[in-house]
Amino acid sequence: MESQSILPPPPPPEDASAPPPPPEESAAPPPPPDVSAPPPPPEDLPPPPPEPEVKKKKVGWGTKRPATTPLSVEELVRKKREADAAAARPKFMSKAERERLALEKRAKEVDAQRRRTNGTPNGVDGMDLDTPSRGFRTPNGDSRSIPTGPRAMRNGDGPTPTGPAAMRSRNDSGTTKSDKKVDKRFNEEDEAAAQAALIKQRYMGADQTSNFSAKKKRKRTTDRKFNFEWNAEEDTSGDYNPLYQHRHEANFFGRGRLAGFGDDVADSVAKKYAKALEDRDREAGSIRAREILEMERRRREESTRNQLDKHWSEKKLEHMRERDWRIFKEDFNIATKGGSVPNPMRSWDESGLPKRLLELVDRVGYKEPTPIQRAAIPIAMQSRDLIGVAVTGSGKTAAFLLPLLCYIAELPRIDEFEWRKNDGPYAIVLAPTRELAQQIEIEAKKFTEPLGFNVVSIVGGHSFEEQAYSLRNGAEIIIATPGRLVDCIERRMLVLSQCCYVIMDEADRMIDLGFEEPVNKILDALPVTNEKPDTEEAEDSSAMSRHLGSKDRYRQTMMYTATMPTAVERIARKYLRRPAIVTIGSAGEAVDTVEQRVEMIAGEDKRKKRLGEILSSGDFRPPIIVFVNIKRNCDAIAREIKQWGFSSVTLHGSKTQEQREAALASVRNGSTDVLVATDLAGRGIDVPDVSLVINFNMATSIESYTHRIGRTGRAGKSGVAITFLGNEDADVMYDLKQMLIKSPISRVPEELRKHEAAQSKPTRGAGKKIEEASGFAGKGGW
């Protein structure tokens, strides 16, 4: 073994012209030529003399390597061209050689199959005992097996070494360090991609894209399924069986019938059965037949009563069910709270009002009740205390006037005895402004004069002597503002000894104007003998109506408002007993019939120019109302409007009562085109057929804005409200944007939507504006 390891390799064969044998398929391909290795010596030269043995030098990373001479480009191109030409030439192989190669290949396949099937004697699968042992190699490439020959000849199936061992690849396992680096880089990239996918799913949610495709061809699973159903034309039983040709009809006793048939079939069956009874027995059978037909008629009516496909407007009142009432309330946006609240009325005939009062309603022209009238009148007719929350212009005046007239109609006439005149009215109606009080008086006289009742209004701007003269004959109903009514009580012009009906209209506006203390004084002046108990008995309509026709009837209190601030709730808790709460829509919202438009215009001159363009466009017919915030601006804008060729009047707190009434009368009768006013005209003033409301200055609060635009679109008619907005209105921009969003027919302009002040609700009390006018007493007020 020692001698074999030092022998040089055998010399090449002498016959260089003979073709080399074909390479075996199982042999590994030769390695690429090593460009750093020196070329082999030519064959015709004699072998070089043996070189003296030189001691090996230590090779390391710091050792300087000898410079190698690179090959020329022309030499490489020439070699490549020769190799390509040799590969392109066909190689001739004899038949015997081809058969030999085929037999060798087949023998190797059989041998490999035999080794895989039977295994080796030692139990090691896949090892050839005839070949030299390859041994086990560590990751560093070192062999741990027993050497069987020279290092250069251990791997017999490998290529012959062509250079020093230090310049050859030691990794024989097929995986190089560069491959390991590539795999490691790919693993790191896969891990980074997986982490990025998890982060994307965490913050952006799972992928909602569906991979479903309707065009994708699906495998049909019912092709070979046997069909157990037969078509009608495949039935052959009727050809030979007479039973199928003459089918027997099932006859039921009495009203029995097959399911799935309509009432017409049941009616015909009942008539047929009744006729059979009459034919069998003329006397008793005819009576029984009539009873059966009557039973069938009642059954048909009962089924019609419980039908769900009929609308509530097509049903009778006794046929209405809880589901129908729920749909009815949703249609009119009615919400009620409180115990024992009656159902709304669908028409005036179901209101429970006296016949004489219904005739007056028809004469005045109230065809269909409004939502607040549908819900509030049945509750008020049961002597219940009531809080009505409804949008402006919804018919609240008639909602409390009609039950009031029905209430006092049961009481003795006030002019029957002299002492009754001196005990004061039966009912008082409180309103925040003089104009609203006079408007309620006009509406009330439409019903009270035919019934013989006396109505008197007590408001500021008129002398006390004139109002005392109006009260000389007594009055069943007094309509007043809180301030003037307190003055009359303190001057002993009026007492409330027999007052049993109290109505507060626009209660939230009265609180805003500082009338909370006068309202408390008025309510404290009422008698306590007829006050309702604060128990469940206050919800019992029969108990509250027990003393009909006498003086001792329980007091009934009603409050109507558009919003519910804290002060209004405080008054309601103190003076109302177990009230029923009726809400139409949402508190504080504008009516859906008003189209709200907002224009961002800064500066008085630009707003005046835009106002002139709107009035001159001819798109809106008079009357038109223009609202401003400051009283001195009313006259200036009115002069501008007159210069444009339109007639105009002003309405504000510096006007006398006669001037206010004359201005409203000129607008109502059509002699004036434009009314320029402050918030004095923004609450409760009813000017018919107002087509346009212009807010020259935005209101200081969203509640005032709501009642300003409520002057148009009243009684179900449509209207338009245009508001000029500036940066000084930042406190109300957020609420204004929310109101425009809720309106189905309005649009939020982009300037308002993107404005900084409209993004969040302002803090309470920050930048709150103070209204200039502060009351209604004399010229100093509105």
From Swiss-Prot:
GO cellular component terms attached to this protein's record: catalytic step 2 spliceosome; cytoplasm
Motif Q motif positions after renumbering to this chain: 346-374
Reactions this protein catalyses: ATP + H2O = ADP + phosphate + H(+)
EC number of this enzyme: 3.6.4.13
Main location: cytoplasm
GO biological process terms on file: mRNA splicing, via spliceosome
Pfam families reported in the protein's UniProt record: DDX23, DEAD, Helicase_C
Domains: entry comment: The Q motif is unique to and characteristic of the DEAD box family of RNA helicases and controls ATP binding and hydrolysis.
Protein name as annotated: Pre-mRNA-splicing ATP-dependent RNA helicase prp28
